[in-house]
Amino acid sequence: MLLSGYLCGCAAKQTDAPPPTTKSPSATTAITPLSPFIRRIFEDRSGRLWFGTNGDGVACYNGTAVDFFSVKERFPGEAVRAIVQDKHDAIWFGTDHGLIKYDGARFTTYTTKEGLAHDDIWSIIIDRDGLLWIGTFGGVSRFDGKTFTAFSLPAVEPNLDVGVTSERMVMCIMQDKAGRMWFGTAGGAFVYDGKSCTNISEADGLCDNSVNDILEDRQGRIWFATHHNGICYRVGDKFTHITAKDGVNGTEAWDLYEDPAGNIWFPIENSGVYRYDGKTFTNFGEAQGLSTNAIQCTYQDRSGRFWLGGWQGLFRFDGDTIISVGEDGPWEVTKPR
């Protein structure tokens, strides 16, 4: 399938960012979560940690204090599901109220009024050419900073079992090393090679058609996190399904992450978090102190701290134990990971 779409100029709404609500870390025994649900974790080039929530906007830890940006601070998004940084150091947020750009001083909001496919955003990536690809409830948009262009994918059967009522919803977008674009939908994965778009589904060996996340690891394997049948990966045209015989339990997987050492991490609903070191799958959960069975994202920052986000907020894993991290911390690792 070739690119097809519309072009339109953008005159997005800008709002100066007032001083954010700030909490400074202090010694405390009571943990007040950053938010009841953390959906996305991202570290920008200056070392600030951003935490996208499922209803409270975004929180930012700058190494000294936590800043909160929500509707009260003129940040219109409530659920923040995607965070990226462009080459000009602007931070982009994919939210349930449109695409939001933060330049360090003000927020600029882009919605369907400017040409976005849908205001409910689920994924964003910046490709090798610097273009934003935005996966929404109503399809895919590309954005060059001035103009939105629609990218057409085939309609798929909605996944009503998980509340997906749209034929165009795109859960995730990934660009592989060859430059191909991958899209996760309720009808399997689609891969675009610059000329045509190919569907990859259960008929081809995919473990489940409801794809929540896609990752290419450093070895070139393409991993899929699915909603009903866990994790699988693809080498060439061959799929390998990760199951209980590999030591992995559960079926609902939302996130895939490769750490700097090449380990693959993925949380599975009601089964904690798994790490694959290339040979063995290791589970981390209640035995290590994790107090929730609903982790949705994992991330290692440049200082080596490993973060987990999900229901009940933010957690940090030091290699042996998992602790809750709230508005007042604790933010620093007390022992080497």
Question: What are the roles of these predicted feature ranges?
Answer:
Residues 1-337:
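Carboxylate-rich, polar loop motifs that coordinate divalent cations or form catalytic acidic clusters
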